[in-house]
Amino acid sequence: MNKTQDNLKAAFIGESEARNKYTFYADVARKEGYHYIAKIFEETAENEKYHALEEIKMLLGESSTRANLKEAVGGENYESEDMYPRYAKEAELEGNQAAAILFNQIAKIEKHHRDRFQVLLDMVNNEMVYKRDEPIKWKCSVCGYVYKGTVLIFRMNKPKSSDYFKEQSPFSD
């Protein structure tokens, strides 16, 4: 990795961290009655989001949903099976039970994220995003049109790639 790539990675991490901190700061300001300050924090957080997006695009280049899902499965697996369990053990050894509980809870959530991404990756790999073996309800997120069937039928001249239709979630949440 060259210096510019290192800088793009560091900038992405910094902008991402700033976005989350500013979102947190906005909540604090709002709780304290500083609504205008909260709005400024939120606006700045949104700016930081776009800075980070430009940096990650430059760093990673073009990718596909399939590749992104595969990377997401790997990342969530690392977090759920290695990172957070290790952090929990370290917190326990240091006597910080609250942090240990938090890390263990997050590990479970990351496992759920991994499993969800894996289901979606399997759906993409098996070309089952817009078709099912059994009829399901498909709903247009723009006009509210609901259709029940095994294959999504597009309405209102909306292209498939526009994500106007969503299915009933294949997940239990």
Pin down the residues of each PLM region:
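Non-heme di-metal
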Residues: 1-173
